[in-house]
Amino acid sequence: MKSTKTVLIAVGLMLACGPAWSQAAPPAPAPARGTRVPQANWWSEAGGDAGGPTRIVWAAQKTPETPYTGPNKPIWHIADILKAHQGQARWEQKVLLNRDFDGRYVQMAPGDKTKCIFYADDRVFGWVYSGQVKMTIDGQEPKTLSKGWVFNVAPRLSYCMETVGTEPVVFYRTAPAGQVPSYPESETPTPVPGYKYVKLKINSTGGYDSFNVPFFNVDEYGASDRRGERFLYDGHTSSNLNIANNITELPPSTSWGHLHQNMQEVWLDVYGSVCALISGEGVVHGEYGDLINANEERWHRATSCPNTGKSIRMAMTPRSKEGQVHYFQTDQPPGN
């Protein structure tokens, strides 16, 4: 009899609460735009360099390690570049050339002005080391950039540069490798061997979004507490402003960082001092304006140099939006 009474009480409670129990649970809030949601079958997720399960894999690494060729070397010191061109009013020094990027340091003399050019499908970007330059980009108000500013010219937007003031301007610039520029109708194209310029029409244009801005003040960014901001990020080109905190000593020599396959990782020191371990080269010490290059399949680990404060390195890599694999040591925590 006791058990029957218990059952009846339970049934009565179910009937009383029935309408509430039968209602569907409220839908889960939608993830923020751009957030990657883990899936049970992770292999079908959109590309990315993080968020999947840890896997142990076999990765191909060149032996001997990938050599540096052409203008590429572990580190270019801006002091050496300036010394090599001492006494010249204007010059260009190629410091990077790979499948994706053609990187150069450039000095323009007072009064110099470039022709307006654009590239069909890729960006031009750079950073001002010293002096002042007026940047004119289609659709943007002309802006005078001084030390510490970066610029990002979207594809199909023509741009011109003009020195401002009585001092030369020195800047770093990355253009798409192996590509010949186009010109607006108002310009006279500079001849290029093996090509002829023909007058055509286009109806494509470029622009900016939350990940891409035409101008960004890195010196101001470095002096602030802000983090995680981008000025350039698309399917072909990525240039992150990687912040590293002050440290008192370098990580142990057993921590190698990570490596990439089939691509270099290049850093321009745009704030503070950067110390980078590159396999086969040891630790290279970068100062403001130096360019550091970790060649394909070489281990690399970048930090601030000990006891020098915060640093920012402008990382230049391809394919970041679709994801780029960071290969880590199996017996160490993930390196930077």
For each feature predicted by the language model, list its residue ranges.
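A short hydrophobic beta-strand segment most commonly corresponding to one strand
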Residues: 152, 166-183, 293, 308-327
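Bacterial N-terminal signal peptides
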Residues: 9-18
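Structured core of small recognition/catalytic domains
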Residues: 228-305, 310-312
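Short beta-strand His + acidic residue motifs that chelate non-heme Fe in jelly-roll/DSBH
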Residues: 114-116, 135-136, 153, 158-166, ...
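Bacterial N-terminal signal peptides that target proteins for export
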Residues: 1-8
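Short, conserved beta-strand element in jelly-roll/cupin
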Residues: 107-108, 118-135, 247-250, 259-276, ...
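Short acidic-glycine-tyrosine-enriched beta hairpin
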Residues: 125, 139-156, 280-298
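A short, N-terminal "cap"/entry segment at the start of jelly-roll beta-barrel domains
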Residues: 24-102, 115, 181-244, 257, ...
